[in-house]
């Protein structure tokens, strides 16, 4: 634990010359509002918001370039509260700074319908750049924002001197001990150093307290040394009240352009709560009436009043609105001059901000003739990306060290990064479009979210479907935010083959479909893959993330695939030859991905027995379920109860479509190491097995 002498030193104020009583009053107002808000609702995290009051005030009032009247301003700095549990750190600044929150919003913290939920939520509260809460996600996504900032500069103003472009800005982060402990920050921080992201500035709130009290029980590393080892520019500031040290550290960080900056700020959580500061009780619970009253006495507030904000303090802090508009106007002059110099790039920017695609963007998408050589859908996806590359400069992405397997490299594209990281295989350029995440799947997921949140580009990232488990927290958060990240997940079943059960997805499709707002797209062949990419890219921001599920093994190019049908999520691929117009089939075979070919073959076998089967390709359950019921009933007539679902995964998500009398051809156990043909045969994925299931469904 921290000694009393150390606490005294760490809480000794050091203010710059311009600092006045009104600045001190504003900081104390932040502390009191944080204590009052948590006390009123009875739960929350007051301590960090109290001890970080000087830092938050300095960042929002004195450091960041932003405009409270336009929270979507292209030239703004971004702020990421990775320590999302300390949401009051952000909310109170948004209130004091005039971003759209009022005192009543602070008073309604963590209550139904409020603008101030327990953790910051993107799209919910004006001024919140990203949803945070699961620790580590914010810092990792901030790395993506910094990468997106550089790529944006490369698209629109690549030749400007550092700091001279209207597209230059900073990404500021506040991270906690918990963020530092999470593995995703290690992954992302390592990559940030490789990328030399000089516009990324992270404040690490080193208060050494978590829910279980003193972090020494679980964290005893020299974190600053770890970040130096990564290759970051590292500074250490002693004391959360040391505004001089904070400002000097920010200035030093801004001067370093070839490395991300890490500022370890040693604070005392809960300061100035006399009995609970520097304890776990200040971290995640209300302080209690007596302790809150004591805090107010210490800072000169009336202990009997709540939510006190002096009028002169609010007038002072909301001066940020005018200052922000002035900064915006100065930036606009630079931006307008750039627009006059670069009319073509300005037109591109306008298109991206409007979320529009260029005319003819999909004209060169590849098409494969039915019956042509079998092709893995991952290979088809790679061909699609290379065809789209010249038309869509906003599209960029890569893989978690599996580019050759995932087929995620756009033909002819340089790698994104400083030229110094170039290898024999890859040529890196500051503004390249091929991303190399390394074996860092979790960071990749979070970084993709940061890229998309920053805008205005589209990003994708690939790995094996099995390793989507490593990405799941980031994928869920992207779905919660309704952002349009794209995940390319290949090697999608036991069809992966010889690598065996550790790498063969079994439960993954159902597990991913369980995430609300995530669209899971598993095309049947090369053409459905092209149609899937077309649909994904045509969707506007706010339509949610998409996981594109692709095969390792070759699959036949099918007859009857349909672009509109893919966009609807499911469609009639073929009806048995004997069916008359308007006549219903005897049985419906519903399949996805590589198993659609089995349904087609089973349809022929059933026809030999005078059973008329319909084959429905269902690349995306989520898109299909969003269709009007008239369309769904036309594809799956309710009167046809004999149904079979075929998918090389667990059956969990298919019961709703096949009903009690239907059958599911699935796999409910782990696989083995063998070639894919053997595995499919031994585990019952054959046309004969599908036909037999159809006959059972008819008998049910």
Swiss-Prot record:
Binding site for thiamine diphosphate: 48, 85, 133-135, 178, 207, 283, 467
EC number: 2.2.1.1
Binding residues for substrate: 45, 283, 378, 405, 491, 499, 552
Required co-factors: Mg(2+); Ca(2+); Mn(2+); Co(2+)
Reactions performed catalytically: D-sedoheptulose 7-phosphate + D-glyceraldehyde 3-phosphate = aldehydo-D-ribose 5-phosphate + D-xylulose 5-phosphate
Record-listed Mg(2+) binding positions: 177, 207, 209
SUPFAM superfamilies the record matches: Thiamin diphosphate-binding fold (THDP-binding), TK C-terminal domain-like
Annotated active site: 441 (proton donor)
MF (Gene Ontology): magnesium ion binding; transketolase activity
Keywords: Acetylation, Calcium, Magnesium, Metal-binding, Thiamine pyrophosphate, Transferase
InterPro entries, per database record: THDP-binding, Transketo_C/PFOR_II, Transketolase-like_C_2, Transketolase-like_Pyr-bd, Transketolase_bac-like, Transketolase_BS, Transketolase_CS, Transketolase_fam
CDD domains: TPP_PYR_DXS_TK_like, TPP_TK
GO CC entries: cytosol; extracellular region; peptidoglycan-based cell wall; plasma membrane
Pfam family, one: Transketolase_C_1
UniProt GO BP: pentose-phosphate shunt
UniProt-annotated site: Important for catalytic activity, residues: 45, 283
PROSITE patterns xref list: TRANSKETOLASE_1 (PS00801), TRANSKETOLASE_2 (PS00802)
NCBIfam families: tktlase_bact
Subunit structure: Homodimer.
Functional summary from the UniProt entry: Catalyzes the reversible transfer of a two-carbon ketol group from sedoheptulose-7-phosphate to glyceraldehyde-3-phosphate, producing xylulose-5-phosphate and ribose-5-phosphate. Catalyzes the transfer of a two-carbon ketol group from a ketose donor to an aldose acceptor, via a covalent intermediate with the cofactor thiamine pyrophosphate.
Protein name in UniProt: Transketolase
Organism: Mycobacterium tuberculosis (strain ATCC 25618 / H37Rv)
Taxonomic path: Bacteria, Bacillati, Actinomycetota, Actinomycetes, Mycobacteriales
Gene: tkt
